[in-house]
Every structure is written in C-alpha cells, then in structure tokens.
C-alpha cells in the first residue's frame, strides 16, 4: 500500500468514500482538499463498461472544454512548405519535418503536449511510434492530429481541445480545469466533458455505459460523483 502524506490523510477525512456527491458539493469539496502549494489540476475520472479487449469498444477521440484546462499547451507540428508556414502563423511552438523527427529520436526531445502531422508526414514519423506511442503523443486521424488543416488544429489544441482515450481498464482520465477556477467554470467544463463522453459511447457496449464517476485534484483524494447530477 502506498504511504500517503500527513496532509493527504488530513484532507481525506473530509471525504465520505461511501457517498455519491452532488456535482456542486463535489466541486466545493475538491477545492477544499486542494491544499498543495501549487494550483492543482482538477480531474474527472470516468469508469466505463466497455470491453477493452474488443477494438471496436475502445474510445479515442478529442473533446473541447468551454473554459479550457488552465494549462499552457505546447504544440509540435510535422509539416513542410506552405503547411509549415500556416502552423507557425497559428501559434505552433515547434514546426519541422525530418529535423524534428531526428531530434526526438536522438535527443529524446519531448517538450510538447500535442503532436500534429500532415498526412504526407506519416512516412517521416512512422519510426517514432515506439517513442511517441506509449506517451500518447503519436499523431492519429481519430484524434484529429493527422490533418491538412494544421492551422485549425493548432488553434483548437492551443485553446484546450484534448485527446481522450480509454486506458487498459476502460477508464477515462480528463483534466477539467484548475482548483483556482471559479465553481461555475469548473461545473460547465465537467458537464461539457461528461456529455461529450456520453456521445462517444461505442455501439457494442451492453448495459450501462458509465459505471462510476470520480472527481479529484492532483494531490487530493477521489470524490465520487452522482452521475445523474452531471446531466441536469
């Protein structure tokens, strides 16, 4: 069992682990237990009923939050010529082709949060799969990160659009803001994220799609949320 800090053990006492909190209560409580010396990220964890062993039940898509996540997103773009210029104009942090691929390979350069590529660049970045894949950074059409419209993609991801994908136990982990956000912004982000996930339900899922919803902060305990209050 992991050993928790004294601070964590103190704030954990504030949370009733057997209760499903109303969303408003959960947000209040999440902010109350966010006592670290930095602005903690508020995270929405959704346990789904998907069968991860079936490829048609895996979720991989993107969602956008009305108020963003509060994090500055670094975007890298693999493109050349006119598309490279469009990416730079849109605010991409790094733009290149073979040179960037080589930097990632040889220097383990990973100082970015999102990688976007034009379709013709897949031949260049194919060899980066072992490096970028496990970190969730490999460009993918399903995630909207393989596209010819690089300018729009850069702007969207800069504004807070993010990739969401189920892990190996069928769970989703979604940053929905910072503890410093006011309650209404957090509420709108959480409800928006949840509704977008509901719309991504794979056709093959049997029974209830959502099994459990938990809200937490970076250093705080999990707070169970009544799913019904997320769609009211």
UniProtKB/Swiss-Prot annotation:
Residues spanning the membrane: none
SUPFAM superfamilies tied to this protein: Ribosomal protein L1
GO-annotated molecular function: rRNA binding; structural constituent of ribosome; tRNA binding
Statement: the UniProt record of this protein carries the keyword Iron: no
Keywords from the named record: Repressor, Ribonucleoprotein, Ribosomal protein, RNA-binding, rRNA-binding, Translation regulation, tRNA-binding
Role, per record: Binds directly to 23S rRNA. The L1 stalk is quite mobile in the ribosome, and is involved in E site tRNA release. Protein L1 is also a translational repressor protein, it controls the translation of the L11 operon by binding to its mRNA.
Subunit structure: Part of the 50S ribosomal subunit.
Similarity remark: Belongs to the universal ribosomal protein uL1 family.
Name of this chain's protein: Large ribosomal subunit protein uL1
Organism: Thermosipho africanus (strain TCF52B)
Gene assigned in the entry: rplA
